[in-house]
From Swiss-Prot:
Binds 1 zinc ion per subunit. Component of the acetyl coenzyme A carboxylase (ACC) complex. Biotin carboxylase (BC) catalyzes the carboxylation of biotin on its carrier protein (BCCP) and then the CO(2) group is transferred by the transcarboxylase to acetyl-CoA to form malonyl-CoA. A zinc finger (C4-type) spans 228-250. One of its GO terms (molecular function) is acetyl-CoA carboxylase activity. The gene is accD. This is Acetyl-coenzyme A carboxylase carboxyl transferase subunit beta, chloroplastic. Its main location: plastid. It catalyses: N(6)-carboxybiotinyl-L-lysyl-[protein] + acetyl-CoA = N(6)-biotinyl-L-lysyl-[protein] + malonyl-CoA. InterPro entries: AcCoA_carboxyl_beta (IPR034733), Acetyl_CoA_COase_Trfase_b_su (IPR000438), ClpP/crotonase-like_dom_sf (IPR029045), COA_CT_N (IPR011762). Its cofactor is Zn(2+).
């Protein structure tokens, strides 16, 4: 029998004590059965002033606990080790249990059983120092008691893994009871609340709707949680960066911004950015069109795919905004002037030139400025005899710049040819492909590396699956545009997870006679 301990501070007046519960992993019955499970506790209850380790043989004392949860987000696990997300906001009347009917059904059954149990009728309340004789006198007090009952249920039926507290501790009407037991949830006679959860990318959103259509509220919890695109488990955002944006549950590599990638690859204090003052304009006067094209994504339509389309690409706000406005919006959102960061630094002491694309900036689309910055970086690396790294994360050529964006493919490829062959300097270019790498980027510099490295399960393609199927009227096998099958076909040299990536690239450089600068000075 596995025991799970729950320690919490309980207070009433100036008295403070700790209650400890043990729970069988196999029990998911009514809450009144918990008395038989607590089998290793002391029979005598010590005085509150003498000990903090008070033990109980009934659940009655536990029900008197007020304000256990008021505005919290919980990641919980039941006795079957199934994970659920529970959000409670009593002030705003929101209660959500992960959209799982079976779990809500279990909660409803146990709550009814608990409410009608003999514990309320047969146990003497006069002997309980924590019993409030006004608890059942009014409807409002009864609602408070219901909230306490549910609190007790949650404390005894689930194992709390992690939580976020907001500091509010005020109960209101028993909308939690209504949500669980279905009373009043859809009533037309009283105010009705419904809760919807939605996930897009890595964002968690909970929407509350009332009978008043103008009174919908949406709360975004992406500041706290990151949802894995593969297993849909929650990752705590505060610790996610230290995990290199890798899901702790399944090891899936989620998207990583350019600044974090620079921090991952470049030694601290050695990063020197280049050409930060270069920004895009509207070279073909895209916004002056009389009848502008309604765009679905910010990449060339031939390259578009559901995995590449931007999250904001479907919103009316972005459809109606101009190209310059979208650039300004991306600059504010990312803090970057363009969809790539270029510069120099040291990788394990080895001087390198590096460019890292930023997918959150208009889908990492390649326009004139992106092409110019990459070309200048290549020229600088050639003149300084530096190895070159380009980290690709792009939806392809930027359609708002028309043929000028397509020209960047030839421009960069030509610069790489001079860098690797024409100069006879035997320089070394490593291409690192991340998800997604598509379109014009795939058709140019992404596939021209001396060594081509890809992250696990990255989406790498020229035309997207949907476009191929609609154009050629043939089915594209699921997963055929991922890293692993491309590696098996010989299109990639290495598949390297983020954890050892820096050391792997460092060893490749040393094999090609690029050594740390301090060793070079000694020689």
């Amino acid at each position: 029998m596995e025991k799970r301990w729950l320690n919490s501070m309980l207070s009433k007046g100036e008295l403070e004590y700790r209650c400890r519960l043990s729970k069988s992993i196999n029990s998911l019955g009514p809450i009144e059965s918990e008395g038989s499970i607590i089998n290793n506790m002391n029979k005598n209850i010590p005085s509150h002033s003498d000990s903090y380790n008070s033990s109980y043989s009934t659940v009655d004392d536990l029900v008197g606990i007020r304000n256990f949860v008021s505005d919290d987000t919980f990641l919980v696990r039941d006795s079957n080790s199934s994970s659920y997300s529970i959000y409670l906001d009593i002030e705003n009347q929101i209660f959500e249990i992960d959209n799982d009917p079976s779990f809500v059904s279990e909660l409803e059954s146990s709550f009814y059983s608990f409410r009608n149990s003999t514990y309320q009728n047969n146990i003497s309340k006069n002997d309980d120092s924590h019993y409030d004789r006004y608890m059942y006198d009014t409807k409002y007090s009864w609602n408070n008691h219901i909230n306490s009952c549910i609190d007790s249920y949650l404390r005894t039926q689930i194992c709390i893994d992690s939580y976020i507290l907001s500091g509010s501790h005020n109960y209101s009407d028993s909308y939690i009871y209504s949500y669980i037991c279905g009373e009043g949830g859809n009533s037309s006679e009283s105010e009705s609340f419904s809760i919807r959860t939605s996930t897009h990318g890595n964002n968690l959103t909970i929407t509350e709707s009332s009978n008043d259509l103008d009174n919908d509220r949406t709360t975004n919890y992406s500041d706290f949680w990151v949802i894995c695109e593969n297993c849909h488990k929650f990752n705590y955002k505060r610790l996610f960066k230290s995990k290199m944006n890798i899901c702790e549950e399944c090891g899936y590599h989620l998207k990583m911004n350019s600044s974090d990638r620079i921090e991952l690859l470049i030694d601290p204090g050695t990063w020197e950015p280049m050409d930060e003052d270069m920004v895009s304009v509207d070279p073909i006067e895209w916004d002056s069109e009389v009848d502008p094209i309604q765009w679905k994504s910010q990449v060339d339509p031939i390259e578009g795919d559901s995995e590449v389309d931007l999250i904001e690409g479907d919103s009316e706000e972005y459809k109606d905004s101009s190209y310059k406005d979208r650039i300004s919006s991306s600059q504010i959102e990312t803090g970057l002037p363009e969809a790539i960061q270029t510069g120099t630094g040291k990788l394990n002491g080895i001087p390198v030139a590096i460019g890292v694309m930023e997918f959150e900036f208009m889908g990492g689309s390649m326009g004139s400025v992106v092409g110019e910055k990459i070309t200048r970086l290549i020229d600088y690396a050639s003149n300084q005899f530096l190895p070159l790294i380009l980290v690709c994360a792009s939806g392809g050529a930027r359609m708002q710049e028309g043929s000028l964006s397509l020209m960047q493919m030839a421009k960069i490829s030509s610069a790489l040819y001079d860098y690797k062959y024409q100069s006879n300097k035997k320089l070394f270019y490593v291409a690192i492909l991340t998800s997604p790498t598509t379109g014009g980027v795939t058709a140019s510099f992404a596939m021209l590396g001396d060594i081509i490295i890809a992250e696990p399960n990255a989406y790498i393609a020229f035309a997207g699956k949907r476009i191929i199927e609609e154009t050629l009227k043939m089915e594209v096998p699921e997963g055929s545009q991922k890293t692993e099958p491309l590696f098996e076909k010989g299109l990639l040299d290495l598949i390297v997870p983020r954890n050892p990536l820096k050391d792997v690239v460092s060893e490749l450089f040393q094999l090609h006679a690029f050594v740390p600068s301090n060793q070079n000075s000694i020689k």
